[in-house]
Amino acid sequence: MIDARYLGDYKVWLEFNDGRKGVVDLSDELHGEELEPLRNRDRFSEFYLDYGLASIAWLDGQDFTPEFLYDKLKAMN
């Protein structure tokens, strides 16, 4: 992943290094104890691009694997 931008309503525009890009909706993925705090839209919007993980992450340690996001992007677009 080389770029990520928050669009609102848990939607994130992603770009991967192979040229694939598009929008993923993560609203249905925020379940479980670790991800529950991200249901707060303000908190969700504070993700950053972690170049070590090649994915988006949050300061409290939550993240999605790049493979998961790539597959979700392929399925949505």
Question: Where are the language model's segments positioned?
Answer:
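Motif-centric detector for short Cys/His coordination patterns
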Residues: 1-77
